[in-house]
Regions:
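Helix-loop-helix "hairpin" substructures at the membrane interface of multi-pass membrane proteins
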Residues: 141-212
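Membrane-interfacial segments at transmembrane helix termini in multi-pass membrane proteins
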Residues: 264-306, 401-405, 409
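Hydrophobic alpha-helical transmembrane segments
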Residues: 18-23, 71-76, 98-102, 145-150, ...
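Hydrophobic alpha-helical segments embedded in the membrane of multi-pass proteins
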Residues: 26, 30, 49-50, 105, ...
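Transmembrane helix-bundle core of multi-pass membrane transporters
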Residues: 3, 104-159
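Short loop segments and helix-boundary regions at transmembrane helix junctions
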Residues: 33-122, 221-235, 248-260
Length: 418
């Protein structure tokens, strides 16, 4: 690893921390995606907390504080906790969240008691055990990084080999069981992957903050992709970026690495939820505002064009006919004016020629949507739940939209509307 120290213009400790964070980010990102999709993300939190008593018992039994011994203890305790959670979740009268809570609280309590007893024993070699609570990345050595990359490789290979089974169980457990797939094996494999991710992250972010690395990259990736394989890849990439950037930022600021990584991961997930295209809160709010504006404009066009499109109408009268407030109507009229569809003069509104053509198109689109509702089942169409009836061609294609329009024109029930 000396060549890497020479290649990067960073202190050796910073390089080690960044590499450890890289392995953690990739492992937690990929494994956490499966946990989030399976609604088992808190199982990872419980396993992380359950690793503490294993570390404490390993130290008490061996009397040594070397990483290998403590890692073995963490693996055993985490595996026992995972098996216990799976067993309790199959108990008919015990909810899944209750099983997780029992294991998490019980194991963490035992871990805190043992760590407190070890600290009060006065043994000189017990210093640093409490770092497994919040992580102490500055204390990792090359052997820790090597172990992290080995565990990362094992986790990635397992995910690749078991992708088909994991995908089926993740999205439809009942169907998978009916199809004869090894559902319990898949659940055990998912729990084992969580154990691996937790062991990789204990030294970096600690037992308490480990859940952030399992959830945040997966939540962020979920906002951008809809398929499992791209989500696993993107989540691993996001986790790697979060881990490395957190390690470098904490080194530059001289603050603990674990909390910084957790903060960056949380910020990344929040920003993705807010700003992601098509799914983000901001994009959805903007889309709904535009949809409401289009709907208001369409309602006004149809109302103004219903009787005498060329005759001026007073906004107050239009509001009364529509059952809307005058303020609502005037806001819509402003939109029509800006689009060149209406003219307001002396507090009277008149549709322009373009406005009358637009009203006619809107009326035909609404009639076609009505035809979809009434006759769509004959054409093998899905339920008419299209949020924008003015853009049926975008959902059904030009040919099918034109066919619905013809059916609407030929339907005598719509003659009065036309």
């Amino acid at each position: 690893m000396n060549w890497l120290y020479d290649l990067l213009p960073l202190p050796g400790t910073t390089v080690l921390v960044a590499l450890g964070a890289l392995a953690l980010g990739i492992t937690a990102g990929v494994v956490g995606s499966l946990a989030v999709l399976q609604q088992r993300s808190l199982v990872g939190d419980a396993i992380a907390h359950a690793a503490l008593p294993g570390i404490a018992v390993a130290f008490i039994v061996s009397g040594a504080r070397d990483s290998a011994t403590l890692t073995i203890g963490a693996v055993i305790a985490a595996a026992v906790a995972a098996a216990l959670i799976l067993r309790l979740q199959r108990t008919p009268r015990l909810r899944a969240d209750a099983a997780i809570g029992v294991v998490l609280a019980g194991a963490f309590s035992v871990g805190v008691v043992l760590l407190t007893w070890i600290t009060g024993s006065g043994r000189g070699d017990q210093a640093g055990l409490e770092s497994y609570l919040f992580g102490q990345a500055s204390g990792i050595v090359e052997s820790d990084v090597t172990l992290s990359f080995i565990l990362m490789a094992i986790a990635l290979i397992a995910v690749i080999v078991l992708t088909r089974i994991l995908r089926a169980v993740t999205f439809d457990r009942t169907f998978s069981a009916a199809a004869g797939l090894p559902v319990r094996f898949a659940e055990a494999a998912s729990a084992a992957l969580l154990v691996i991710a937790v062991v990789v992250g204990l030294r970096m972010v600690g037992a308490i903050l480990m859940v952030v690395m399992l959830i945040a990259p997966a939540v962020a990736a979920r906002q951008f992709v809809t398929r499992l394989s791209p989500m696993l890849a993107l989540s691993g990439l996001i986790g790697a970026v979060v881990g490395v950037s957190g390690a470098l930022a904490s080194s530059a600021a001289g603050v603990p690495t674990g909390p910084v990584i957790a903060l960056i991961g949380t910020a990344t997930a929040v920003l993705a939820v807010l700003l992601a295209p098509h799914r983000g809160v901001a994009w959805t709010a903007r889309h709904r505002m535009r949809a409401r504006s289009r709907l208001r404009r369409t309602e006004l066009l149809l109302a103004l064009d219903h009787a005498q499109p060329a005759a001026p109408r007073v906004p107050d009268a239009v509001a009364g006919d529509m059952g809307r407030s005058v303020r609502w109507v005037r806001r819509g009229l402003g939109s029509l004016q800006r689009a060149g569809l209406a003219v307001v003069a002396n507090d009277a509104v008149t549709l322009t020629e373009a406005g009358r053509r637009e009203a006619q198109r809107a009326r035909e689109a609404v009639l076609a949507w009505s035809a979809w509702i009434e006759h769509g089942w004959r054409l093998g169409l899905p339920d008419a739940r299209e949020p924008d009836p003015l853009n049926l061609a975008g959902s059904l294609g030009d040919e099918m939209a034109a066919r619905l329009a013809r059916m609407a024109r030929e339907d005598p029930a719509h003659a009065a509307v036309r």
